[in-house]
Amino acid sequence: MMRLPWFEHRAPGSVQEAARILAGEGADAMLIAGGTDLLPNMKRRQMAPKILVSLRNIAELKKNGSVLGAGTTLTEIVRKTELPLGLRQAAHQVATVHLRNMGTLGGILCLDSRCNY
């Protein structure tokens, strides 16, 4: 099994703090929420950020209601009965339960998959 390369982990508590970290660290830093795409790419050495800036502790990205923040997981989308049925069904079709529990809307929208073959 390939191991992750070394990286520093930062967990800001606000969008403003995350933005300050990104501005200060530049290209050495990347955002991470669920990590379902980023971490496998790091294991394959397709990406090698020196700093991962976690979005998990930023409450404003997980607001209640029909607003879907970048940190909303696919499982949360499936369970939001106020959302259109088609959107909930589409979220339910993505990957496995484990990946739906981890994968975030922001990560899916910013997905940077590459063919490894």
Language model regions located:
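C-terminal structural segment of proteins
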Residues: 1-117
